[in-house]
């Protein structure tokens, strides 16, 4: 047949190229050949009587050379079993307008109604996480690890399934340490990740039709990892790899087609709030003075929010003293536009700046819609609603402050709403315009301050989570989740506020005379007195404490993140990136052989309703050599006394069903500097403080003499004895851990410390599962 000829024919569209083994010039100098001596001629006679010359073949003798490397072999356990852990997970789920959030942090949320997830993720995978996914029925194991306390990791195959309409970009990281920094989330922005040569594009079926519906990636073991047999407890929390993924838009990379501009607009508080931003009760006098200055400025009431916040209060008859003439119409300015009489107002927050307004009611010609009596309503309404909230909530509501009330406080929609009766008469805010394609990042600063901080300046000690010299559209990506992990406060969105400094906005968000000055942005919905997303259902407790926080500033970060290049614009209600994984493991050990004896008299049928046997999977956390019987523990049909004693000393596990973890296991940890660690140490309770102290053998007696003498004077004898006992116990635990590490090194079971998670020492000391 001619099939072989057709198959061997060279294709015409492939250009000719030189094969690497047929190069004209060799890339490496060869070793000189050994010179051979002259061969000796040997003649022999053939059968036909004719002679033919024959050459004797000399055996080539090579030169003995030493081996450049030696192979270190490790004896394998008697029993080995290959296991593939196969499962399916959503790498990320992005709800509407959640592009700037980290899905790994919100993967276990139960908030409803509202959008779910986030547009980027920082996932990590460990053996513990794989077992947790098995308990959630999200994967299956092809072999059991019961009674097999050793393991080897061989890598993983990842399969990413393409979405019909949305593109994604992923990056696989196997280089330790697997920790998040302030640059991790900005580097995952699609505008940044598109410039990374190690990033992989996952195009949608619409962007690249006609190709496979999945993309396969082979990932080896992490760097700095030695392939050998380990106890499963040692590899339980070792990070195998991290997956960085983000949504992207390849069809419209520079702005959504549903908008007519790429410019982002938001509002920031004016400078009158600089020294009055704190919510502490001790600062109430300053807030009261600012509140009086704002309420006396009548042009601020030229907005429809005045009717929404104060008219129901007046119509309900809550204005004191009550009179028949106290109606909403009594607060409206009735002066017609027939006079040019003017009124001068002092702008709040200053003593020298004055504004001249007409006394008429035409707001388009700098008139005031309401008369001067309206200035008394915000305070009365705020005090009335604050007392009502105190009565309803009782002891759970501790602080009653009318300056922070929803209807008439400092941050009421009357002052902060962007919609004014006349656009040239703004409120107590400044409109900011931002073009992402002019941002070079130089001089940009993004940080958070606690709500108790008394000013808007950046402080190296009080301010947290600084991101500088990056474009705002990149710095806003995953910022709130990074702050929650960095500070350890899972309620950070209600306890801190965002501040921005940038010279690339219009007007510039900076003060040349004060380089550390920041500005507090807020969303359009917060200015209109609404919840994020536009809902008017504000909880009663939040109405009593209405002020800008990260919860109300998230929409500003969302708008900044979506303005960057290749950013996803939330055109679909919900999108997800699915992934299949196949982790390859080898379980090993020397288990005791179990003999199963069945009843021979019981009738069994090979056919019928047969149910497949399920595998018995053991938690790798407790699958340690100390908790497993081995062949050397079994002598003469019985277990030895040492094995029984070893098993009795181990703690037993109790099945306690908790409400769930505060943070998902798949979320990566964050890197803490030494300065942040010292600040956090001051907030820890006494046993942990003692645990973090320097051991006695590393501390000199001269340095301790001064501090101990002062402490001993104030403490009683019993307190000193309790503290010394606590120190001795912690010292004993540390010594036992030290001996355990030395023993692992001697057994060749040590793991590179960069592969282990942070905080493992504390968790092991107190025997708490991280």
Swiss-Prot record:
Transmembrane segments: none annotated. It is found in: Virion. Residues 647-678, 697-717 are annotated as: Disordered. GO terms for cellular component: T=1 icosahedral viral capsid. Keywords: Capsid protein, T=1 icosahedral capsid protein, Virion. Residues 666-678 have a biased composition (Basic and acidic residues). Disulfide bonds: none annotated. Self assemble to form an icosahedral capsid. This is Capsid protein. It comes from Torque teno virus (isolate Human/Japan/TRM1/1999) (TTV).
């Amino acid at each position: 047949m001619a099939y072989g000829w057709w198959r061997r024919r060279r294709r015409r569209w492939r250009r000719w190229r030189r094969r690497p083994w047929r190069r004209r010039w060799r890339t490496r100098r060869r070793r000189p050949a050994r010179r051979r001596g002259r061969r000796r001629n040997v003649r022999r006679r053939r059968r036909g009587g004719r002679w033919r010359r024959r050459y004797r073949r000399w055996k080539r003798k090579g030169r003995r050379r030493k081996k450049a490397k030696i192979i270190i072999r490790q004896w394998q356990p008697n029993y080995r079993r290959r296991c593939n852990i196969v499962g399916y997970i959503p790498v990320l789920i992005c709800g509407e307008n959640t592009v700037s959030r980290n899905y790994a942090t919100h993967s276990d949320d139960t908030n409803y109604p509202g959008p779910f997830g986030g547009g980027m993720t920082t996932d990590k995978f460990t053996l513990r996480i794989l077992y947790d996914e098995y308990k959630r029925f999200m994967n299956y194991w092809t072999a059991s690890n019961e009674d097999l306390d050793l393991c080897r990791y061989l890598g993983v195959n990842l399969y990413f399934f393409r979405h019909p309409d949305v593109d994604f970009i992923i990056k696989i990281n196997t280089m330790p340490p697997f920790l998040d920094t302030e640059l991790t989330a900005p580097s995952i922005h699609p505008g940044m990740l598109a410039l990374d040569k190690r990033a992989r594009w996952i195009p949608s079926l619409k962007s690249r039709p006609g190709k496979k519906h999945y993309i396969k990636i082979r990932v080896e073991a992490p760097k700095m990892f030695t392939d050998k047999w380990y106890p499963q407890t040692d590899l339980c929390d070792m990070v195998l790899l991290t997956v960085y993924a983000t949504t992207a838009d390849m069809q419209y990379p520079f702005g959504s087609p549903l908008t007519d501009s790429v410019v982002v607009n938001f509002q920031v508080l004016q400078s009158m709030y600089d020294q009055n931003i704190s919510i502490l009760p001790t600062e109430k006098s300053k807030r009261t003075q600012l509140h009086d200055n704002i309420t006396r400025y009548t042009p601020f009431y030229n907005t429809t929010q005045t009717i929404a916040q104060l008219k129901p209060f007046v119509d309900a008859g809550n204005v004191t003293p009550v009179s028949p003439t106290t109606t909403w119409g009594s607060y409206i300015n009735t002066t017609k536009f027939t006079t040019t009489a003017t009124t001068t107002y002092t702008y709040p927050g200053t003593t020298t700046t004055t504004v001249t307004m007409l006394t008429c009611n035409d707001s388009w010609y700098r008139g005031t819609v309401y008369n001067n009596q309206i200035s008394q309503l915000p305070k009365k309404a705020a005090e009335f609603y604050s007392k009502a909230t105190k009565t309803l909530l009782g002891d759970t509501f501790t602080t009653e402050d009318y300056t922070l009330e929803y209807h008439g406080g400092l941050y009421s929609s009357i002052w902060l709403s962007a919609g004014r009766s006349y656009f040239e008469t703004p409120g107590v805010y400044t409109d900011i315009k931002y073009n992402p394609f002019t941002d070079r990042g130089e001089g940009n600063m993004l940080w958070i301050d606690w709500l108790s901080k008394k000013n808007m300046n950046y402080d190296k000690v009080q301010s947290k989570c600084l991101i500088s010299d990056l474009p705002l559209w990149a710095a806003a990506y995953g910022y709130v989740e990074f702050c929650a992990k960095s500070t350890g406060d899972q309620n950070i969105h209600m306890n801190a506020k965002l501040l921005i400094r940038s010279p690339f906005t219009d007007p510039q968000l900076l003060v040349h005379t004060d380089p550390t000055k920041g500005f507090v942005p807020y969303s359009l919905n917060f200015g209109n007195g609404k919840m994020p997303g536009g809902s008017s259902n504000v909880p009663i407790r939040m109405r009593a404490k209405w002020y800008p926080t990260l919860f109300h500033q998230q929409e500003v970060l969302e708008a900044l993140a979506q303005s960057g290049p290749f950013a996803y614009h939330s055109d679909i209600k919900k999108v997800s990136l699915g992934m299949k994984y196949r982790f390859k493991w080898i379980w090993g050990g020397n288990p005791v052989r179990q003999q199963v004896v069945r009843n021979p008299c019981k009738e069994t049928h090979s056919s019928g309703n047969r149910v497949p046997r399920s595998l018995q999977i053991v938690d790798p956390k407790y699958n340690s050599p100390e908790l497993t019987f081995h062949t050397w523990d079994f002598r003469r049909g019985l277990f030895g006394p040492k094995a029984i004693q070893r098993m009795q000393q181990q703690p037993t596990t109790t099945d306690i069903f908790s409400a769930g973890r505060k943070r998902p296991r798949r979320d990566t940890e964050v890197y803490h500097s030494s300065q942040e660690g010292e600040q956090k140490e001051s907030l820890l309770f006494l046993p942990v403080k003692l645990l973090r102290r320097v051991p006695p053998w590393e501390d000199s007696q001269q340095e301790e003499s001064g501090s101990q003498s002062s402490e001993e004077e104030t403490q009683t004898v019993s307190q000193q004895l309790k503290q010394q006992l606590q120190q001795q116990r912690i010292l004993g635990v540390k010594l036992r851990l030290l001996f355990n590490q030395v023993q692992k090194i001697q057994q060749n079971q040590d793991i590179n410390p960069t592969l282990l998670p942070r905080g493992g020492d504390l968790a092991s000391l107190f025997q708490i599962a991280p």
